[in-house]
């Protein structure tokens, strides 16, 4: 049986991010949005539709996305990049350190799906602390929540 959720009337964090990004994009033409094949998961749809020339779909290539964002920032753009928390904290640490932090580039990094409650977008995005590698790992944890 599917878990029932109570509608509190509050916006979800990723919905707030998408709405805020869209509003900021209307005010500042330097803003560029980039994602690693997660436009729907991060609610970037409205920005991509309204500003297609300022939206970059990078595919499943978070490291390349961070490098491209740093390059855009050097040219005066303000890139907002988005991916799952597991990937922007673990998979791209070197790129963030070398290309964003050391260079003091103006790159904004947003992430979502930090816990284990958004299983509908895939359990592969769960943090390593929520996995075990002998069996099904994250999938086992997800099923226990249902």
Where are the predicted features?
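Thiamine diphosphate
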Residues: 1-146
